[in-house]
Structures are given as C-alpha cells and as structure tokens.
Swiss-Prot record:
It is an enzyme of class 3 (hydrolase). Belongs to the DEAD box helicase family. DDX27/DRS1 subfamily. InterPro entries: DEAD/DEAH_box_helicase_dom, DEAD_box_RNA_helicase, Helicase_ATP-bd, Helicase_C-like, P-loop_NTPase, RNA-helicase_DEAD-box_CS, RNA_helicase_DEAD_Q_motif. It comes from Aspergillus niger (strain ATCC MYA-4892 / CBS 513.88 / FGSC A1513). CDD domains: DEADc_DDX27, SF2_C_DEAD. Its EC number is 3.6.4.13. Residues 541-685 form the Helicase C-terminal domain. Keywords: ATP-binding, Helicase, Hydrolase, Nucleotide-binding, Nucleus, Ribosome biogenesis, RNA-binding. This is ATP-dependent RNA helicase drs1.
Amino acid sequence: MAGTKKRANADDDFVLTLSDDENDTLNQLEEEGEGDDGALATGSKTKKRKRDDAAAAQQEKGKNKKVKKQEQQQQQAQQKKKKGKNAPVQEEEDEDEEEEEDQGEDDGALNSDFEFDVGGAANEVRDFDGWEVNGNEEGKGGDKKAVDIDDIISRRQAKKEAELIRKQKKKKQKQEEEFSELEDDDEEDGGMEVDFGDDELLAEDGFGMGVDGEEESEKSDAEDEEKEEGSDEEAEGSDEDEQMDEDDDDAASDDDSVATPVMHPDDIASDRDSDEESQVDAEEEEKRKAFFAPEEEKTSESAMADAKRSFQEFNLSRPILRGLAGVNFSNPTPIQRKTIPVALLGKDIVGSAVTGSGKTAAFVVPILERLLFRPRKVPTSRVAILMPTRELAVQCYNVATKLATYTDITFCQLVGGFSLREQENILKKRPDVIIATPGRFIDHMRNSASFTVDTLEILVLDEADRMLEDGFADELNEILTTIPKSRQTMLFSATMTDTVDKLIRVGLNRPVRLMVDAKKNTAVTLVQEFVRLRPGREDKRLGYLLYLCKEIYTGRVIVFFRQKKEAHRVRIIFGLLGLKAAELHGSMSQEQSVENFREGKAAFLLATDLASRGLDIKGVETVINYEAPQSHEIYLHRVGRTARAGRSGRACTIAAEPDRKVVKAAVKAGKSQGAKIASRVIEPAVADSWAAKAEELADEVEEVLSEEKLEKQLAQAEMQVTKGENLIKHEAEIKSRPKRTWFETERDKKAARKLGAAELNGPDAGMSKKEKQKLSNKDKKRLDDSRQRQEAGAGWKKGRATRESMKNGQLPKAKKDNKKKGKK
C-alpha cells in the first residue's frame, strides 16, 4: 500500500504542459496499465527521471541566483560610492527578499507580469473599420496583379531626370570646350599690336568729350515732358468721357422700361417635375394604405422614451451586447430604435434613413439575435443579404462578423473577384448567413451542387431602390422566384421608394414602413458648396478640380466621376502633378481600390457611382463632384460618404448649365432642411492656369496610357500561357467539370447592362459612339427621302440611268422595250 501511495503522489506532482512530449507521456501511461510489476517498474523510472529533472532545475536555479547576486553586488558597490551609509541597509533588504523567494512562499498576490485580457473587445474598439480585411481573407482575391500607374509614372520620371542630367553634362562639356577654344584664341592674339587710332582715348572731363551725350539727354528730357502733357490731357478726356457715359446711362434708364426676369427653361421643367411629385395621386395613396401595415401613432412622451433607450432595453442576448460594445455601439440610432423591435417579431420592413445612420446594424443585430435560438443539429443557411456592389458586400461582411464575434454564427460572402472554388467549399458547410451580390448568388444557385436556397427564412435587400432599378430587375426576379415565399423580407435605403408597383415585385407581406427622416434629406452636419461654371467654360472643369485639390481640399477626399474612363485619366494627371490618388470603379478589385486610401497612403480616392452607395470609408472629410450626377437621389448618396455618424463633412460640386436641375433640387432640399449651403467663387485666371498645366500634360498622359495598355497585354498573354499549360496538365479534370449555366443570353445581359448605365448616367450613357454622333445634312435628307417614299407607297428609288434619261427627255430603256413589244 505504501508503494502505491508514493506512486500516486508522484503522479499528482507530474503536470502536463504544452512543452512536454505528449507522445512519450502517453506511452508511459499505456505501459503503466500492462500489469502491477510493469507499473512499479515504470513508476520507479518516472521517479528517477523526475529526480534528475528536479536536480538539474535546482542547479540551473542556483546558477541563476549566483549570477543575480554578483550583478546585485556590483550595483550595490556602485551605490555605496554614491550614497555611503545607506547602502548596507538596502543590501540587507535585498537579501531578505531573496530568502523569501527561495522559500517559495505565495502570499496570494498577482504576478506583476500578468496581463488580464477581456476577450479582445477593447482591442476591437480601437481598430474597428468596415473595410478591414482579416488575415484569412487576404488571399482569397486570387493572384491577379494590376498594372501600377505610380510605377509607370515614376519610371518615366526617372528616365526623364537621367536624360536631363545627361543633356546638362553634354551642355557643360560643350561650354567648357568653347571656353578653352576662346582662351587659346586669346593667347594667340596676345602678341599682336592693338590699333587705337579710331578710338577716343581722352578723359571724360576732357575738351570735347560728352557733347553728343548732352544733346541726346536734352532730346529725351523734351520727349518726357511732351509725354507727361499728353497723359494729363488723356486723363482729363477720359474723365469727361466717363461723365458723358454716366449721363447717357441715366437718360437711357429713365427712357427704357425695366426688363422683367425670365426663367430658364430647365428651371421651368424642374418646377413642373417637383409639382408632379408633390401632388400624389389619390389612387396611389389608396394603394399604399392597402399595401403597408398601419403605422402606430406615438405621443411625445413615448418618443422621448424611445430617444433615451439603449441596446440593453431591447432584451438582446449577452453575446450580441458584448459584440455591440466591442465595436463601440452604446446607444441605438433612430433607425435602429425603430427597426430592431419590429424585425425581432419577424415582420416585413421597408426602412429609410439618411446616409451614415447605421442601417446595416439595424438589420444585422435582429438577425443575429434570432439565429442564436436556431436548431443546431443540422447546419442550415437561413439568411441571405443582397447588395448591389461587391465593395458594399465586403463591408457588410466585416461589420456582421465583428458584431457576431462572441457567437457561433457562421458567415459566407459570395462576391466577384474571389475564388469560386473556395466559395463552394464554404457553402458545403452550410453557413448561417450569406452576404452576396445578385450575379454571384445566381451563379452558385445554378451551378454549385452544395448550395441550396430552400431553407432561407430571411431576405435583406440593402440599397433596395438601386436593386429595384432596371439594371438589376432580371437578376432580382430570378432570385425571388427561386427562394421560398414564406420568408421575412427587409428593404433598406437612404432614398427608399414607396411606389407600390415596384415593391409588390419583391413579394412583401403587409410590410411596416419605417421612414425615420424626410425623403431626400442630407446629414445635418454636412456643408454643401457649389462652384458654378459659366457657359463656354465647361472645358476648364479639370482646372477647377486641380485648384480645389491642390490648394483647398488636400487630404481624405473622394472625387466622383460619371465614367471610369475619365476617372482613370484624371488619376494619371494627379500622379504626374505629385498628388497621391487611388481609384475605385468596376475595373478595379477591392484590395487595389481602398487599401491605399484607407491606410492614408493616398489622399484622394477617384471613384464612380459604384462607391456612392453605402460605403463607409473611415475619416472622409470632403466629397467633390467633378460633374453633377444624373439625379438628386444619386447626389444624396454621393455626398453621404462624408458627415457620417454625427461627424462633420463638406461636399463641393462643380456645376455647369446642364447640371442646373440637380443643383436646384439639392439647394431646395437643403434650404427646407436648414442645412448650410454656400457658393464658392474661384478666379477664372487661376482655373485657366491649372487647365493649361493639364493640357501641357496631354501627350505625357497618352504615353502613360499606351505603356499601361502594353503591360496589360503582356499580363493577358502570360495569363493565356498559364491557362494553356493548365489545360494540358489538368485536361481530364477540366473536361469532367459540368459547364456553368446562366438564365440569360448574351443579348439579354447586354441590354440589362445598357439599362443600368442609363439609370446612372442618363439615356445617352448606354449608346455607342455611332449612335451618339450628330447626323449630317446628307444623312438627314436621305432619311427624309426614304420616309417620303414609304408614305407614298413607292418602294423603289430612281437610279442614275433613269435620272439622266429623264433629263434628256428620253424614256428609260425598260419602257422603250415595252413600247416596241406593244407595237409588234
């Protein structure tokens, strides 16, 4: 029994740690179970090894103590020299502390090196950003490398500098050679006699010197006096002319009647449109009453109580509250206060609030709360969140994963630019929430065997008014007809439509309408500025932009363009002028687009309307509209990239005559809201100078574009080579894959793309150059002639022979033949 107790005590003393060899320990434990004799033998071996380890540790400890004592003695010796008598007392105290350490007494106090970690919430508050990409997600974008404009510009500038230095060296060498030749000539001429026969060698005060000079000076003095008299007469004459002009103006103003102001045709059209919008059809109003759920009437007391509510009062689970605290969300915004209780009840919602008011959290929080109570036996995808752009989907994915940090809810993002195979592998695990763009969602829905939509219970459409436009109509209909009809549907946007005919398509069931702010409102903290371009100065628009970016708004600026081609050209000009800029449009991937701007490496983000919706890029101070957008709704989304979540911001729009309608709508909405609106005046001469600088760089821009095109072609060729190698190497596997299908033909996709472009940039945006160009008079006449022939019923056109024969008074050849046949 005694031996068994000793062995038990020895086993209790032995503690498994991460540094121990687990395999050896497991083998020893297995050997212990073989028999009593084997167990005793193993126990003795273990004791022996432990004693050896303990002795080695004690020796090491003793060595460390000796080293420490030696160091302390040296320090104390130095202190004795400085302090004198106080040193021995300190030495005794140190020795007492060492004895206590040797005894190994534990007084229950925490080690000073111990750090308490609250689970990462504090760290996440500091570093939270909607654009943050986790380490695991960084490699999902593929190995595609884009052409770097900055590299091309820096290479070209380095070449130019080297060439300039070489030219300067050559010039210097030439000058030195010329100088040396001149010196040689001077040396050769040094021995020659100089003839001063024709020169005046008298002193200046000598007789006859300076006579010509005095005559010339007298003449110049006389001329100056005449000029002064003439200028005085001119001044008097100009004063008289001015007085005469003023008298004429007064007489004219008395005789002529005052002209009445005439409205601009665009103003008349915009007023008519606004009147039509304000007068809501009675039939439409009846439709809305029947379609939407009745709204609850709230008293002022209940409104005050709602304003004071916090997230704790929604009875949310502790993991959700902890996630909200982790991203520093303490009090809900108005849209969150209204949405969360209704969404938790499972009702359909149509929500609208100004940009930057927290709409993403308004639908993510109730979804997470409902998913905490899901059955966990079988993994199932229950939620689909659809976004119009991949950048917005990536941002929503990052926000949702941050809020769900302390839960077991899984997410998947299905967006373009990421590997299809990796997305399919994640879908096999049936994630709870799928955040996707419509195109990639349909692709997986049709072609991924592991993805099923039969179990979806919640559908969210963010930026729903954009999703309901013609460009997304076909894709949205395909999704809505495939997923279950018995679902909860939530629609959110800053400019949410309430047209019943559009909302019926989504399959809403008596939705609750949650309109927090008045329609077409901006944030209160936003200052709106407008720079007016006079007629005939539209070609100087780039000069105004360069002045604004170089002199006034120099950091954290988003510049919006209508077309990515123009954005790319301005990006090159910015690079040549030394302005650090990044691009964000459909041809760029998300990593290329925002990473430099988010990290502060680029001061300007040149974007199209792709980035105007929903994107929450941290610290944006200013938004500049290079051109006013197609509609007031797009303008609201653009300027909503700044002044978010209560922060201040500024929006500046460069507006010409064609932009009058949008500018007037923005000013009218801002004044009704009480927002600050200002007009910025830029001197035309300053703008012209910057425009001239941009024109000087036109050739350089073309060369950079051609070099970029060449690099893209090389990259494309390399990709084709790699593709060919893979086809040869993995031929069997590639041929065994089923062909990916789509619900539309290429013609239908092209038509949908045109409709989407027309929604953003007007009817002319989707047209080709041939369709856009103006018809010549010759073409117009040809079209008129063809129309007249069709109206007259004559389907043929007189040929050259017919016209010539009619001029000569002869019948056409065919008619002659017919006449001869008739005579016979």
